């Protein structure tokens, strides 16, 4: 499945990629989310019939990734939808087309599977990510995300 273009090779992720994903994420967020990445990769690779998570390499070095999943019928949606959970690009490789290459491959793969929509969420203050996704064709979805804070219950 490896596909090379403009010096970027896009391939399927493996469990061995987890430590590198954690380091990239930590460089971006300042947090260590080892358990999250290990769990996410394990579910994507071992518990799913279809793997849609991809990695991008430059000179054999993993410099970016997209992690996602397919959902069938959640939240009253009759058709399948792909969810983009994470897009990572090593800060040292930012603005070199890594994210674009990953999304281009991901969307092509999803279309081949008959998936018509890819959805993600962006924090309101992640302006760079929002602009990047807008440039890639993402638009606000006709959905309202609701949240209930589960702090201490009143007595």
Give the role of each language-model region.
Residues 110-122:
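Conserved GNAT acetyl-CoA-binding A-motif
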Residues 3, 12-16, 23-79, 85, ...:
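Acetyl-CoA-dependent GNAT
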Residues 1-3, 121, 134-155:
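Terminal substrate-recognition subdomain of acyl/acetyltransferases
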Residues 89, 95-108, 135:
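Conserved acetyl-CoA-binding loop-helix of GNAT-fold acetyltransferases
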Residues 100, 112, 124-142:
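Conserved active-site alpha-helix within GNAT-family acetyltransferase domains
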